Regions:
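Conserved N-terminal phosphate-binding loop of PLP-dependent enzymes in the Aspartate aminotransferase
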Residues: 1-234
Length: 234
């Protein structure tokens, strides 16, 4: 086919594929969401960016889920010391209002094409997106995501020491994965129906946590308490 899938952080595999000279573009999610909160390392990302540059391949960062402050920086790739050619954005850009965008490096010369766009530049969507940026700045939500993410991850790792069902805690900012030695459904159903706490999931054993960027310490503590109650009952 025309698409090749390669393992995250296996730089040698990516370099081998890129050095064939027929790769148009590379798309990576710097923190994989549905992929299980797997994180690209700086060494991998920088090596990949260099390989793309060497081979004339476009580097695309998918920031739809991990961008817009979610990781504790505005974009997740900023943790990795790279500058992609294209950045895809959605979800957080409109805080629930349907909108998406594509950020393009100034290295690409803009030209007029034949096609237009049906919903592009929608005034209501753009107004919502501008309001989101205002609130993020006024309420320091990116910094709050970093601080509260650090706190939540630390508390979850502390909980791991007394809860053998937790096998791993990983993530950055408010994009966190908690892995169990039991199916995530065993934990998630109790959280939803008994503790009234909604979470995401990935794979078969991972609880995926993406709380609002405005989460408070009290709310984080409340979640830890509810999760502890559920785990104690397993």
């Amino acid at each position: 086919g025309h698409v090749t899938y390669l393992p995250l952080n296996d730089l040698a595999a990516w370099e081998e594929e890129l050095d064939k000279g027929d790769v148009c573009a590379v798309i990576i999610e710097c923190i994989q969401g549905v992929g299980g909160i797997q994180m690209a390392t700086p060494e991998f990302a920088q090596g990949l960016a260099a390989a793309c540059k060497r081979n004339g391949t476009i580097l695309v960062c998918d920031e739809i889920q991990c961008g817009y402050g979610r990781s504790g920086k505005f974009f997740a790739h900023q943790w990795l010391g790279i500058k992609p050619d294209l950045i895809t954005v959605a979800k957080g850009i409109g805080n629930g209002f349907p909108m998406s965008g594509l950020l393009i490096s100034p290295d690409f010369k803009p030209v007029y094409g034949q096609l237009g766009t049906t919903f592009g530049g929608n005034h209501l969507a753009c107004t919502a997106a501008l309001a989101v940026l205002d609130v993020m700045e006024q309420e320091n939500l990116v910094e709050n995501a970093r601080q509260m993410g650090d706190y939540l991850i630390a508390e979850l790792k502390k909980l791991q020491q007394s809860q053998p069902h937790i096998t791993d805690v990983r993530g950055r900012g408010l994009m966190i994965g908690v892995e169990f030695d039991v199916p995530h459904a065993d934990v998630r159903k109790k959280l939803v129906y008994e503790q009234h706490c909604f979470t995401g999931c990935a794979g078969t054993n991972l609880l995926r946590l993406l709380p609002p960027l405005c989460i408070t310490k009290a709310e984080a503590d409340d979640f830890i308490s509810r999760l502890t109650t559920v785990l104690n009952a397993l």
